[in-house]
Amino acid sequence: MISDKSPPRLSRPSYGSISSLPGPAPQPAPCRETYLSEKIPIPSADQGTFSLRKLWAFTGPGFLMSIAFLDPGNIESDLQAGAVAGFKLLWVLLWATVLGLLCQRLAARLGVVTGKDLGEVCHLYYPKVPRILLWLTIELAIVGSDMQEVIGTAISFNLLSAGRIPLWDGVLITIVDTFFFLFLDNYGLRKLEAFFGLLITIMALTFGYEYVVAHPSQGALLKGLVLPTCPGCGQPELLQAVGIVGAIIMPHNIYLHSALVKSREVDRTRRVDVREANMYFLIEATIALSVSFIINLFVMAVFGQAFYQQTNEEAFNICANSSLQNYAKIFPRDNNTVSVDIYQGGVILGCLFGPAALYIWAVGLLAAGQSSTMTGTYAGQFVMEGFLKLRWSRFARVLLTRSCAILPTVLVAVFRDLKDLSGLNDLLNVLQSLLLPFAVLPILTFTSMPAVMQEFANGRMSKAITSCIMALVCAINLYFVISYLPSLPHPAYFGLVALFAIGYLGLTAYLAWTCCIAHGATFLTHSSHKHFLYGLPNEEQGGVQGSG
């Protein structure tokens, strides 16, 4: 029988602080060669009034986080949705972005209130075996995301060079450019954030240009955006809608955002400062994801206009009669609906609107791949340091991640063809969706715990909304698996799927169980997991020191 009485509450030096489990005093960590080596001061202003100077000081983490909404996997998902369903799935893109904002809001609040990122909190609360398994799944998500960035960058080099740079060469080039970008943050945190802002601007301008030249029907676009219907849709459209959600909400991005917000100097001994930081980070994230939504909308609308219901024969004839006739051979001469990817997408834009459209598309794709590369590096370092307390330099970290990403990508690029490389991109979108519960469940667990978040714990409405998000994610994953099973090439693969499913469902069930405990389901609590109700045994739970 578990007592409903919580342990005595003691005073503590800062708001939402989390101490580790009893044990030897930790040794001082070496200087961290990460994004967090520099803190941005927050200017003073009258309490209770909105300040543009303060908003500017808080601006940065949200835009870095938003880059995961614009990676090559998202671009491919957008263009395929446009080609398959026209403008009918724009409302799915809108609401998937809103769901993503809700998840990122929780991540930012955890980092601000506790002063720890999600990986660090997982290290404190989960036992060793679930913690290691959880870390491995997030590392898998990061490697999968990095593979998408490698694919997108390699294809952009191939398009920009008119095919002179083979795909496998483009993959190898990504090794060099990644290490080049690692030196950028030596020039200061704000300059690094400004560079990411430049890459987002390049994407907005390039994909915005495609939108202008394609000139999609504004009435049909607005209808697809506001009406949550899909008349005449079947399984292909439904699978594409599921793919949009999986591509938009990425698991490693939740861990990343919870760490990025720690780069601002927030006095966590003052309740009012914590509340203010939460507000400004939410405003910044809303602006950043609004920009990412507009860019994704540009891509989906362009291909909804240019590709929807188009056959391979029609695409072949368009290219054969254009200045890019050498590209016509990539489209088979049949009456099947064209199956588009990020390579074919650039080609058909060039055939329809001139070579400039192709090269501008490739530049936008290159910007998407490069920006995502750096944020993936930071996510990997934060996750490794949080879960394992293992300090690696950025150089070593990116070498590990990029090596894991490049090997399978090079093999596909060398021994298979472009279609298989783009198909790998689609498979990686499915992987990201399957791994999403391993980020959403922990963030929902810890942000719902008063022992961790104090008065900033999720309220009933927030818990209801985020629980619905989790149910939606699980339903999406189940649908993905059921839809994918018939496509397995050999019955022997079913055994591998079953083995994977046992581990996957076991870890998901454990995380769901602890999440229910954190939501107050005391009847589910085991004596070994009382800390999900009351906090860690030696955790100090007092109020705020200072004014509030």
From Swiss-Prot:
One Pfam assignment: Nramp
User: Which parts of the sequence lie on the Extracellular side of the lipid bilayer?
Assistant: 74-82, 161-164, 215-237, 305-346, 416-426, 486-493
Keyword tags: Endosome, Glycoprotein, Ion transport, Iron, Iron transport, Lysosome, Membrane, Transmembrane, Transmembrane helix, Transport
Its induction, per UniProt? In response to lymphokine, such as IFNG, or bacterial products, such as LPS. Induced in macrophages at early stages of infection.
Q: Where is this region: Disordered?
A: 1-29
Where in or outside the cell? Late endosome membrane; Lysosome membrane
> What is any one of the record's Gene Ontology cellular component terms?
lysosome
Family assignment? Belongs to the NRAMP family.
Q: Which HAMAP family match?
A: NRAMP
Q: What is this protein called?
A: Natural resistance-associated macrophage protein 1
Taxonomic lineage of the native organism:
Eukaryota, Metazoa, Chordata, Craniata, Vertebrata
Q: Which gene encodes it?
A: Slc11a1
